[in-house]
Amino acid sequence: MHGECDVWYFDSAGFCLTPSIPYAWQPIGSVIEVPTSAHNRRINVLGFLTRHNALVPYVIEGHIDTDIVIECFEQFSQHINRRAYVFLDNASIQKSRKFIRHIPQWVKRGLIIKYLPPYSPELNLIEILWRFMKYYWLPFSAYMSLQCLLQAIEDILQRFGTDYTIAFEMK
């Protein structure tokens, strides 16, 4: 990374067996069937992302809460090697008293929390990663089972920055 500090964007995204398919092409008169599950189990990905495609993801099967978000920040803050600004949205689990109580401890480690303006997801660059994963990179086969979905998500996250990249404009 360049400069005196690092800038990261944090957010979480949920993935389930109902595919996010914006459109599909098929011959006239044919039908494409996408199997879905009646079970609504989720895979949640929490992550820290830079404009340079550095990604620190945390994959959680099931529900996320303040304690899980705190643990992600705790782990992340212990591995930074210089001042890091983390921009995040105003989700209640990230604005809870419990979360806020940990901020001074993270600041001592060089991790500075900055909240984005309310209702401004376009300012959180990691939202672009979630969109690419859901609408472009996850194959149809990922939705066959929760295990297939987990495997596909982990594959994308592992290969992000090399095989999967996002070209953020620097203005």
Ranges and model annotations:
Residues M1-K171:
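Short functional hotspots at interaction and active-site rims
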